[in-house]
């Protein structure tokens, strides 16, 4: 196994190229961006977010990827296997420049034990979703989805606002760190628990969290005062949720909403067992990994028991996609799935319309390029009041991490329209450099994850993985700049397959053709996937938008 060497990487900015074209340069800059200290959780270990979600297998592989990208021709394609460059072929100019497959295991061996053995041997890397596919943009990447989730929850249960409510959650890493700001954006008070003080401090630095304390008494006092005044406030509480949630229950504190985004998907590297410090957990993890995992799983069970107790007391409780319910059930907690996942509870209607987390980053590094695209959004979709409100909130609240970037949920037709107009701005010189356009793997038609995105599908097709593979295949055929297929993101080994796409708007006619195709096929997959599962809204959208579904009228007969 190659010995790791610590290094520090920073996102490259400006208009001077290291590579032979902007498309290759875009890949390189987004790889760097994933590992920028402003962006990544543990950049010296190549870990971007989500437990051990990495950008490259090791530093030797990272250096090899960089060298390949610097010399890659505009008609060549580089192949990445779990964070390591393994091949390079001449293809054509409208083919992807990079194709990536991360963490993919044959189903019988798709579990953490086998993955960990392969990783020890230097044969595999965990790519999470956007870590190994080089399109992570920091906590903003999940922020609007989190905001929309809490907004829909507020509409369903609290009259449209979280004002005067208290949300309890845990896990303030790269993904979970969006929760505090999303709650306060919706007017609520939130206590976010994390055992790692440095993670909360990072959220404080980026203005995603307002306050930090190691005292439960202090956290509850702050929360009570803000709740009584109807003022938004986010509090980062240092501690272990498996313990603190039960303590809050014992005190009889009225909690209105409970969820969780700890790294429960990975019982070895993600979740800290109750009663262990970070240092003690690290030592146990190395000395006795089996014991560590057993303790972590028991703590997760206790954590879910607390969530169920809050639900019985009247709180709105939902799973935020980290597979903690499954672990608790495997540990003997039969009622672990008594509370729903966030997708069937709040997000699926958006998926039926082909909507999802559309994102873009300014390769120039100049925030003004993003502010120009913010104005473009308002020019293109003036009737979408929720979208315009989101852009205003993002401009006020979001601190850029690494390369300036923006995210907003756009649907079928809207994504293509936005992409083509961004390309026009680049061509006309209104933006200083090309723009990278991509998305999370958590999208309407790119993931199979029975405990998250595809939980409780209408036709029972939760575990059908074909859709994620078809998404990658059609986006490759359509000419995405880099396309990825991953396994295990969000929920861990054995529980998900998912695909990512990125396309570069460099102002050229070539880019225009690719944007037109990819930004149609990609959200189109969401519509056909949900129409095939029997969702009437998706069928209606398909008819209205002209999305061809050959056997739509046959699907109801089980064909």
From Swiss-Prot:
Pathway: Amino-acid degradation; L-histidine degradation into L-glutamate; N-formimidoyl-L-glutamate from L-histidine: step 2/3
Family annotation (InterPro entries): Urocanase, Urocanase-like, Urocanase_C, Urocanase_central_sf, Urocanase_CS, Urocanase_N, Urocanase_Rossmann-like, Urocanase_sf
Binding residues annotated for NAD(+), in chain numbering: 50-51, 128, 174-176, 194, 199, 240-241, 261-265, 271-272, 320, 490
SUPFAM superfamilies for this protein: Urocanase
Keyword presence, Cytoplasm: yes
Enzyme kind, highest EC tier: lyase
Transmembrane segments: none
One GO location term (cellular component): cytoplasm
Compartments (UniProt record): Cytoplasm
Entry-linked Pfam families: Urocanase, Urocanase_C, Urocanase_N
Entry keyword NAD: yes
One Gene Ontology biological process: L-histidine catabolic process to glutamate and formate
GO molecular function, one term: urocanate hydratase activity
Cofactor: NAD(+)
Reaction(s) the record says it catalyses: 4-imidazolone-5-propanoate = trans-urocanate + H2O
Active site: 408
EC number: 4.2.1.49
Keywords: Cytoplasm, Histidine metabolism, Lyase, NAD
Cofactor note: Binds 1 NAD(+) per subunit.
Described function: Catalyzes the conversion of urocanate to 4-imidazolone-5-propionate.
Family of this protein: Belongs to the urocanase family.
Cited PANTHER family: UROCANATE HYDRATASE
Name of the featured protein: Urocanate hydratase
Species per Swiss-Prot/TrEMBL record: Halalkalibacterium halodurans (strain ATCC BAA-125 / DSM 18197 / FERM 7344 / JCM 9153 / C-125)
């Amino acid at each position: 196994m190659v010995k790791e060497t610590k290094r520090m990487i920073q996102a490259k900015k400006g208009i001077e190229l290291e590579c032979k074209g902007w498309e290759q340069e875009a890949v390189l800059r987004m790889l760097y961006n994933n590992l920028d200290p402003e962006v990544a959780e543990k950049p010296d270990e190549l870990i971007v977010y989500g437990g051990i979600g990495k950008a490259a297998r090791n530093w030797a592989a990272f250096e090899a990827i960089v060298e390949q990208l610097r010399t890659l021709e505009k008609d060549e394609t580089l192949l990445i296997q779990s964070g390591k460059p393994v091949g390079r072929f001449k293809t054509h100019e409208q083919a992807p420049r990079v194709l990536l497959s991360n963490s993919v295991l044959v189903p019988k061996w798709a579990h953490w034990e086998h993955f960990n053995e392969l990783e020890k041997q230097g044969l595999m890397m965990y790519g999470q979703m956007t870590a190994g596919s080089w399109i992570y943009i920091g906590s903003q990447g999940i922020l609007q989805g989190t905001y929309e989730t809490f907004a829909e929850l507020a509409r369903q249960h609290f009259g449209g606002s979280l004002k005067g409510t208290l949300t309890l959650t845990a896990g303030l890493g790269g993904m979970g760190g969006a929760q505090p700001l999303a709650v306060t954006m919706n007017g609520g008070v939130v206590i976010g628990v994390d055992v790692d003080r440095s993670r909360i401090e990072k959220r404080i630095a980026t203005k995603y969290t307002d306050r930090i304390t190691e005292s439960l008494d202090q956290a509850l006092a702050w929360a009570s005062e803000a709740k009584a005044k109807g003022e938004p406030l986010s509090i980062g509480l240092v501690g272990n949720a498996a313990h603190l949630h039960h303590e809050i229950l014992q005190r009889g504190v009225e909690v209105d909403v409970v969820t969780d985004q700890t790294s429960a998907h990975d019982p070895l590297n993600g979740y800290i067992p109750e009663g262990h410090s970070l240092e003690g957990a690290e030592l146990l993890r190395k000395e006795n990994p089996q014991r560590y995992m057993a303790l972590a799983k028991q703590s997760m069970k206790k954590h879910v028991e607390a969530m169920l107790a809050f639900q019985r007391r009247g709180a709105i409780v939902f799973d935020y996609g980290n597979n903690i319910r499954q672990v608790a059930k495997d540990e003997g907690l039969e009622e672990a799935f008594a509370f729903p996942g966030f997708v069937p509870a709040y997000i699926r209607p958006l998926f039926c319309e082909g909507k999802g987390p559309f994102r873009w980053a300014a390769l120039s590094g100049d925030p003004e390029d993003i502010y120009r695209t913010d104005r473009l959004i308002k020019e293109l979709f003036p009737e979408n009041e929720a979208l315009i409100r989101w852009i205003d909130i993002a401009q006020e609240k979001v601190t850029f991490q690494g390369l300036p970037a923006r995210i907003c949920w756009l649907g079928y037709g809207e994504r293509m329209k936005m992409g083509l107009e961004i390309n026009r701005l680049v061509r006309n010189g209104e933006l200083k450099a090309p723009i990278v356009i991509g998305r999370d793997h958590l999208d309407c038609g790119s993931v199979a994850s029975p405990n998250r995105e595809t939980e409780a599908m209408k036709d029972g097709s939760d575990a059908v993985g074909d859709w994620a593979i078809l998404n990658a295949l059609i986006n490759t055929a359509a000419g995405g700049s880099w396309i990825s297929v991953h396994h295990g993101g969000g929920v861990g080994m054995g529980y998900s397959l998912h695909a990512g796409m990125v396309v570069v708007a460099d102002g050229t006619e070539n880019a225009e053709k690719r944007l037109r195709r990819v930004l149609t096929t990609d959200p189109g997959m969401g519509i056909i996937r949900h129409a095939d599962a029997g969702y009437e809204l998706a069928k209606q959208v398909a008819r209205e938008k002209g999305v061809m579904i050959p056997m739509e009228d046959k699907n109801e007969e089980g064909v």
